[in-house]
Amino acid sequence: SGMGDSGHREDYSPELYGKEILSVAEDSGFFEIGDPIICGHSMGGFMSATAGYISDKRIGGVIMVDSPIRPPTYDYSTHVRSGPIRRIKTYPDRESILERFRLTPEQDCENEYLVKYIAEWSIKEANNGYQWKFDDTIFDKLGFSHMLRNIAFELDCKLGVIYGTESNMMTDEILTFIQENVPPGTPMVPIKKAAHHVLLDQPLELAETIKGIAKKWI
């Protein structure tokens, strides 16, 4: 909720998102097929881990893609913000709003057609113009910067970590902290020539990496 064509809520929480993920899996019949594997990128990785943690049904595993689990000693003065901070406004036409589309955190992407595709599906007509679809209060309500993120270390199911080698979110400090705290044998797979938005930089390699991890778990 709060993103794309989904509705907006008065409040958001990791537990709420975890329940939403599990509800989708339940409604789609995934639990009837086997133990589902949940995969999420960035903030979605933390919500996927929450889903795996709170589920009362067996989960095949959780794969987190470029989700920075920061150590207690992390210096937030150097923190790269990834959430939208500007309030939504109305643009007069499609062209002007699409020109404003940016990845957050900002990065270059050679696959411009993918960025363009996402931008075109991120807008809606409103107030005699165009607006972004996302809930611009979501990060205020979620309290994301203060929430517990190391829940991934406490999962009963398997865990996988994928990250972009050029990601400014996955620093050496963060990668070392994750490596030292995940269960033995946890796959930590780097994707070369990929920044934080791994799916946009290396979509095919990411898909193959996810499938490779999943096949070893099934």
Predicted features and spans:
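Catalytic histidine-centered segment of alpha/beta-hydrolase-like enzymes
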Residues: 191-203, 207
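Conserved catalytic-core motifs of eukaryotic protein kinase domains, centered on the activation segment
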Residues: 5-12, 73-76, 172-173
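Gly/Ala-rich beta-loop-alpha elbow adjacent to hydrolase catalytic centers
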Residues: 40, 44, 48
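Flexible "cap/lid" loop of the alpha/beta hydrolase fold
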Residues: 49-53, 60-94
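Active-site loop/oxyanion-hole signature of alpha/beta-hydrolase fold enzymes
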Residues: 1-39, 208
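Alpha/beta-hydrolase active-site loop signature
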Residues: 1-4, 69, 195
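Conserved serine/cysteine hydrolase catalytic core
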Residues: 124-181, 187-190
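Conserved alpha/beta-hydrolase catalytic His-Asp/Glu region
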Residues: 88, 92-146
